[in-house]
């Protein structure tokens, strides 16, 4: 029914300390009002799983998600509270290229979410190898940016020790089933504004 499209009051979300995408959008817009930040609106949006636009199918079937957006000057920043690992300013990967229906009180407008440029999602890898006793040995640095970084950090999740070692190994093994990882270190896993480095 339509309840899936209607956000709850921010005060209820705050009391419950829990909410879905609609609830998170509601609390973001309410917090912005309390902080005197203008032009923060709720937006209905379809994820990339839904192939329709509002022009093709002007019904609620176009939407299965809710976010907030912040409009200033001629820019719009799309705020998806369900994606905790993407850096501020980038849209989450599952809403890129989709149309957002932006609530403006008694009116609405439709705005397309930009697709993140390829250079924002670069992976840079440096590997130094040597041949010794008929085996290749080496070390390397894997530097992940943008949504590539987001995917890697989600893949790792909160894995600890042995599980984390295995997840890291899958990220760096180059598709070779004879690859052995001896050790690794990580940088910037907590800082979304910097590349994640293994």
Residue ranges and their predicted role:
Residues 1-198:
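A sensor for short, sequence-defined functional sites
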């Amino acid at each position: 029914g339509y309840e899936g499209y209607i956000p709850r009051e921010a005060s209820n979300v705050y009391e419950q300390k829990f909410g879905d995408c609609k609830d998170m959008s509601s609390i973001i817009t309410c917090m912005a009002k309390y902080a005197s930040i203008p032009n923060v609106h709720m937006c209905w949006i379809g994820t990339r799983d839904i192939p329709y636009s509002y022009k093709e199918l002007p019904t609620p079937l176009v939407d299965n998600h809710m976010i907030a957006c912040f409009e200033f000057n001629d820019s719009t920043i799309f705020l998806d509270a369900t994606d905790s690992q993407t850096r501020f300013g980038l849209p989450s990967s599952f809403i890129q290229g989709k149309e957002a229906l932006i609530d403006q009180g008694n009116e609405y407008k439709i705005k397309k979410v930009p697709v993140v440029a390829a250079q924002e999602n670069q992976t840079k890898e440096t590997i130094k190898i040597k041949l010794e006793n008929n085996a290749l040995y080496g070390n390397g640095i894997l530097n992940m940016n943008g949504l590539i970084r987001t995917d890697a950090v989600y893949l790792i999740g909160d894995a600890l020790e042995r599980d984390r070692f295995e997840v890291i190994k899958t990220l760096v093994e180059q598709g070779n089933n004879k690859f052995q990882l001896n050790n690794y270190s990580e940088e910037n896993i907590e800082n979304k504004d910097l590349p994640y480095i293994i």
